[in-house]
A protein has these predicted regions:
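Active-site pocket-lining/capping segments in soluble small-molecule metabolic enzymes
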Residues: 17, 109-136, 185-238, 243, ...
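Short, well-ordered coil/turn segments that N-cap beta-strands
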Residues: 2-5, 33-36, 61-65, 90-92, ...
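Short, acidic/polar
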Residues: 16-29, 51, 76-84, 145-155, ...
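Active-site mouth loops of central-metabolism enzymes
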Residues: 5-21, 43, 65-77, 130-148, ...
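Active-site/ligand-binding-proximal alpha/beta "capping" segment
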Residues: 119-165, 239-251
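Catalytic beta/alpha-barrel core
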Residues: 36-47, 69-71, 95-97, 162-171, ...
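Active-site-adjacent beta->alpha loops and helix N-cap segments on the catalytic face
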Residues: 17-19, 45-57, 75-82, 100-121, ...
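Conserved, mostly hydrophobic/aromatic
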Residues: 9, 37, 86, 156, ...
């Protein structure tokens, strides 16, 4: 069995205070020796400059960075420029996504789907970049069917993606079923589960409603029952997500990718509960 790989996702801070806080978060999480830190791109590429700045800071600290690139709002020339910039910086990993269309933006851009972006990256840069793509164990909310969604995922891998990071989920069976179905189509690329620590229920419910991630009914009802009792929400969430991670790793998941929301403590608590090495 190969060693499990771990990674953490950040979003580019909007304020000077946020930059300082994220630097402190990185310092804490860097002690865990992750494979990389990924940096989001914002809806329609809205954080492009701040994404680049955050990636530069991560590189300057001696860590591996994986910037996100998205189809939405991007032109071929724009993507080409960013690829060359990242290549010159020594970046070797990219997360290629379709991305979210901001309200008011009428056109998605020159790339319609993530597989087109993956193909373009390969055509422009050969095998320089390890390309990560998104996977949806509970299926993309815009997919016509589960089978169609898996075929779409296969197109991204066939276009040149090396591995995938999933949308977060709280039902391990959905992940194992998705991996099994991908395997039946001949997809062998590693599919790393995305992990969302539970910190605030209202925030989690808002994210989940927006992205189509399912909160199991019993989990939702339990969290709702805690009301404003933040300590109970977080204690329950820690137990739930730790058990999820244990089952995923025990079932052969190749690693875990934590959606940190720029906070170290929730991911560290799960890490420590899992008994993973520092």
């Amino acid at each position: 069995m190969n060693k499990a790989l771990f990674s953490f996702e950040f979003f580019p801070p909007q304020t000077a205070e946020g930059v300082v806080k994220l630097a402190a978060t990185r310092k804490q999480l860097a002690q865990l020796k992750p494979e990389f830190f990924s940096v989001t791109f914002g809806a329609g590429g809205s954080t492009q400059e701040r994404t680049l700045e955050t990636v530069q800071q991560i590189k300057a600290e001696g860590h591996n960075a994986a910037p996100h690139l998205s189809c939405v709002g991007s032109t071929r020339e724009n993507i080409r420029t960013m690829l060359n910039t990242y290549k010159d910086m020594g970046i070797t990993r990219i997360v290629a996504l379709r991305g979210d269309l901001p309200s008011g933006m009428g056109s998605i851009g020159e790339f319609q789907y993530a597989n087109e972006l993956v193909s373009f990256i390969r055509a422009e840069t050969g095998n320089h970049f390890h390309i990560e793509v998104a996977a949806y164990p509970e299926f993309h909310p815009q997919a016509r069917s589960a089978q169609d969604d898996i075929r779409n995922f296969k197109r991204k891998v066939d276009a040149g993606a090396n591995s995938a990071i999933t949308q977060y989920f709280y039902n391990a069976d959905s992940y194992f079923h998705f991996v099994d179905q991908c395997g039946k189509l001949g997809v062998t690329a590693p599919i790393v589960p995305g992990i969302m620590p539970i910190v605030k229920f209202a925030q989690l419910a808002r994210f989940s409603d927006a992205c189509g991630a399912e909160i199991p009914r019993w989990v939702r009802r339990t969290l709702e029952g805690y009301g404003d009792d933040v300590e109970s929400v977080q204690a329950f969430g820690l137990d739930l997500v730790t058990r999820l991670c244990e089952r995923l790793l025990g079932g052969g998941a190749p690693g875990l990718h934590f959606y940190t929301l720029n906070q170290a403590a929730p991911s560290l608590a799960i890490w420590q509960r899992l008994g993973l090495p520092k």
